[in-house]
Design a protein with these regions (language model features):
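Short acidic N-proximal helix/loop "leader" segments that mark the beginning
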Residues: 15, 20-45, 49
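Short connector loops at helix/strand junctions that flank enzyme active sites
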Residues: 63-65, 128-132, 204
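Small-aliphatic-rich amphipathic alpha-helix that forms the alpha element of a beta-alpha
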Residues: 50, 54, 133-196
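Glycine/small-residue-rich phosphate/adenosyl-binding loop
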Residues: 70-162
């Protein structure tokens, strides 16, 4: 038994150094959308550890079509902020009108004039682009399966081959004492973003992840209970739990 334990321990420590291993459920329940960061560098070594573990996310056919661009350059950050603002402005205007923003089911009644007049929260965009490091995540559409491509609605299935990876990045960052948030505001300007970063047209933007050490680590998040979303056998079935 001792020999087996020593073998297991040596394997565990080879992957996760002492002092940085968190319990899985704790990581899942305390990884929050961090947007306020201390002025502290995120090293390339920390990023490499994060991505080295995030890469074990599943993807369709194990094709692993992700590409991550690490942005630190101030000029690029500034341009990202400019690209974020139009989409975020429309988002904010629709939220203020009580709508689900950028929704493909319920058409927006918010006019372009109202959108243009909507003021953005002070400093919000700067928090995203001014994080210690910004990751841009893209997915190669030439390798993902899109089983819903023929349906008369927005496609979502391709996301199954990229968002587990993006979420793994945030989970791994939490384990490193870091944090971030998955944002998609800049996606509305994808062609310009592709040109800015030299991204081929068949790579779709999936997420922008500002990352750093949070000013405050939240440990108690609010989410719906299981009884509100898990049912038995049918959409209108009985709750899985009371």
């Amino acid at each position: 038994f001792r020999a087996c334990y020593r073998l297991w321990l040596s394997y565990r420590l080879a992957i996760f150094p002492i002092g940085v291993v968190m319990e899985l459920y704790e990581v899942m329940r305390t990884t929050f959308a961090a947007r306020d960061f201390v002025d502290e560098l995120v090293s390339d070594e920390a990023l490499a550890r994060i991505l080295d573990n995030a890469r074990f996310a599943p993807s369709g056919g194990n094709r692993q079509g992700w590409k991550v661009i690490v942005v630190r350059d101030d000029a690029t950050r500034a341009r990202l902020g400019e690209l974020i603002e139009p989409g975020f402005q429309r988002y904010a205007a629709q939220v203020q009108a009580g709508e689900a923003p950028w929704n493909t089911i319920n058409a927006s009644a918010v006019s372009d004039e109202t959108v243009a007049a909507t003021k953005l929260p002070r400093g919000f965009v700067d928090k995203l682009t001014g994080a210690p490091v910004v990751l841009l995540v893209f997915v190669d559409l030439s390798v993902v399966a899109s089983f819903d491509s023929g349906l008369d609605r927005i496609g979502v299935i391709s996301g199954g081959s990229i968002y587990p990876f993006a979420w793994n990045i945030l989970l791994a960052a939490r384990n490193e004492g870091l944090g971030g948030t998955l944002t998609t505001f800049v996606g509305a300007q994808e062609p310009v973003l592709q040109e800015l970063l030299g991204v081929p047209s068949h790579y779709a933007f999936a997420a922008m992840i500002p990352m750093g050490k949070p000013v405050k680590q939240l440990t108690k998040l609010s989410r719906k209970p299981v009884s509100e979303f898990a049912v038995l056998e049918r959409f209108d079935g009985a709750p899985l739990v009371d």
